[in-house]
C-alpha cells in the first residue's frame, strides 16, 4: 500500500502505521480472532466507496446516486449465498455483535428466554454475558462444557432446554476447539420448539473451505464476522432462511443501523471471491493442520490443552500447572514477539482480567505461509519463555524474528 498522502498530511499517524506494520512483520500473530487481509481486500476498504451514503438496500435506497453501490452490494450478497449455500444474506452488519443483535431483535422480545454458551466456557459476550446488551435485555440461560472432557455436554444442553423452554438457542463460541454438532443442536431446538441461531464468527473460513461442517442446513439464522478465518475486512454477515429475510433486513436497517459501509461491503465481496477459489480449501486445511500440530508440540512440552487438543483453528492453554497467569503469559510472550490473548478456562478461579489461560490460533500465521514444520519452533519458544521467565529472553526474540523473516509479510 502507498501511504504517501498520509505521510505528507499527518506524519504522526503515518509513523504509527509504519510502526504497526513492523510489529506485524517481526512478530508471530497467534490471536485466534485475527488474520491478514490480502492487498485486494485492503484496497477495497480504502476506496472511493467510502464517500457514498446509501441507507436502505439495493434498488430500495433513501438517497440518490446509489446505482453503483447497488451493484457492488448485490455482488456481495450473491457471493455470500454461493459461498455458504444460503437462501438469504445480509452483508450490512458493521460487526458480529451487531449481526447477533439484529437476529435477537428480529425474533425476540425483551425478557424472552435464550440458551447460549457460557462466556467462561468458551462462549461470547453477546451470548448472554450480564455485562453485554444480550444479558441485560434477555433472559439467557447458559450451558457449558463437561468438567471432565471439557467438551460441550449435549445432554446437559437438552436438559436445560427442556427445563427452560427457550425461544432461541444460540450455538457457537469464541474459544472452543472442537467440532460443533449442528444436527444435535437442531434436534434439541426442535424438541422444545425453539429457533436455532449459529454464531460461526470463528469458524466461517473453515466452513467456507469445507474443513468444518456447515451450520447453514440446520439453522434458522447464521451470523458471522468476516475478518477471522474468513480473512476479510472487519464486519459482519447474516445468513438465514428466505422466510426470515424481510424481518431480518428490517432489524438491520432501520432497526439498529443507518447507512451501510459500502467500502467495507466491497471488501467483503472481494474476500468472498477469494474464499470461492479452490486455493482457499488448501488454506483451511493448513490452518487446522498447523493448529493440531502446535497443540501437540505444546502437550509434548508439558502444557495442558483444554479438551486435550483441537479440531479447528484455536485451542486454550490451561496454565495452572505452569504457575503463571494468562495475563503474565500474554505480556511475557509479547516481549519475545509472540502475540496471544489471556483467556478464561473452564472452571476458572481468576478474574477475566487475569485468567488462568491463553488462547492460541493459527489463522494468521497460516495466511503468512507458516507450515506444520514451523510449529515445533514456535512451541519451543513459548515453552522456553515461560520456563525461563526471569532470565534474558533476547535470544528467543531473535529466533522469532528469524522465523518471521522466512515468511515475509506485505513486502
From Swiss-Prot:
(6S)-5,6,7,8-tetrahydrofolate binds at residues 119, 123-125, 351-353. Keywords: Amino-acid biosynthesis, Cytoplasm, One-carbon metabolism, Pyridoxal phosphate, Transferase. Its cofactor is pyridoxal 5'-phosphate. Its EC number is 2.1.2.1. GO terms for cellular component: cytosol. Disulfide bonds: none annotated. GO terms for biological process: glycine biosynthetic process from serine; tetrahydrofolate interconversion. Its main location: cytoplasm. The record marks 227 as: Plays an important role in substrate specificity. It catalyses: (6R)-5,10-methylene-5,6,7,8-tetrahydrofolate + glycine + H2O = (6S)-5,6,7,8-tetrahydrofolate + L-serine. InterPro entries: PyrdxlP-dep_Trfase, PyrdxlP-dep_Trfase_major, PyrdxlP-dep_Trfase_small, Ser_HO-MeTrfase, Ser_HO-MeTrfase-like, Ser_HO-MeTrfase_PLP_BS, SHMT-like_dom. The modification N6-(pyridoxal phosphate)lysine is found at residue 228. Gene3D superfamilies: Aspartate Aminotransferase, domain 1 (3.90.1150.10), Type I PLP-dependent aspartate aminotransferase-like (Major domain) (3.40.640.10). It is found in: Cytoplasm. Signal peptide: none annotated. One of its GO terms (molecular function) is pyridoxal phosphate binding. Pfam families: SHMT (PF00464). NCBIfam families: PRK00011.1. Belongs to the SHMT family. Catalyzes the reversible interconversion of serine and glycine with tetrahydrofolate (THF) serving as the one-carbon carrier. This reaction serves as the major source of one-carbon groups required for the biosynthesis of purines, thymidylate, methionine, and other important biomolecules. Also exhibits THF-independent aldolase activity toward beta-hydroxyamino acids, producing glycine and aldehydes, via a retro-aldol mechanism. Homodimer. This is Serine hydroxymethyltransferase. The lineage of its organism: Bacteria, Bacillati, Bacillota, Clostridia, Eubacteriales.
